Amino acid sequence: MRVFTAILLILLVLLQYRLWFGKNSVPDYLVLKENVVRQQSANEKLQQRNKLLFADTDDLKLGLEAIEERARNELGMIKENETFFRLIPKENSTRNVNN
């Protein structure tokens, strides 16, 4: 009976050692779980970005309004008989005023 108890105790110690310090132990599991959560968050952000890019691509394929908007904003293009006004912001500089 004592031998059986000793063998069970040794097996318990070995299994506990592997559980806490061996390969694929509890600390390794916790690190991997944290990495999975971080990667899922990054994937969600990328999926949202992809949805926006697909919507933008579809808009460019189907409608001329998006092309016109990009041409105006990025290239500064204007239509015929249109007047372009460029507003330059006033600088906030201090001037010496002689009184």
From Swiss-Prot:
- InterPro entries, per database record: Cell_div_FtsB, FtsL/DivIC
Which domain of life does this protein belong to?
Answer: Bacteria
Looking at the keywords, is Oxidoreductase present?
no
Q: Which residues form a coiled coil?
A: 29-53
State a GO cellular component annotated for this protein: cell division site
Q: Where in the cell is it found?
A: Cell inner membrane
Instruction: List all topological domains (Periplasmic).
Output: 22-99
Q: Which UniProt keywords apply?
A: Cell cycle, Cell division, Cell inner membrane, Cell membrane, Coiled coil, Membrane, Transmembrane, Transmembrane helix
Topology within the bilayer: Single-pass type II membrane protein
So which stretches are on the Cytoplasmic side? Answer: 1-3
Transmembrane feature ranges: 4-21
GO BP terms in the entry: FtsZ-dependent cytokinesis
Q: What's a Pfam family in this record?
A: DivIC
NCBIfam families assigned to the protein according to its UniProt record, in alphabetical order: PRK00888.1
User: So what family is this one in?
Assistant: Belongs to the FtsB family.
PANTHER family, per the entry? CELL DIVISION PROTEIN FTSB (PTHR37485:SF1)
Q: How does it assemble?
A: Part of a complex composed of FtsB, FtsL and FtsQ.
What the protein does comes down to:
Essential cell division protein. May link together the upstream cell division proteins, which are predominantly cytoplasmic, with the downstream cell division proteins, which are predominantly periplasmic.
Q: What is the name of the protein in this document?
A: Cell division protein FtsB
Q: Which organism is it from?
A: Colwellia psychrerythraea (strain 34H / ATCC BAA-681) (Vibrio psychroerythus)
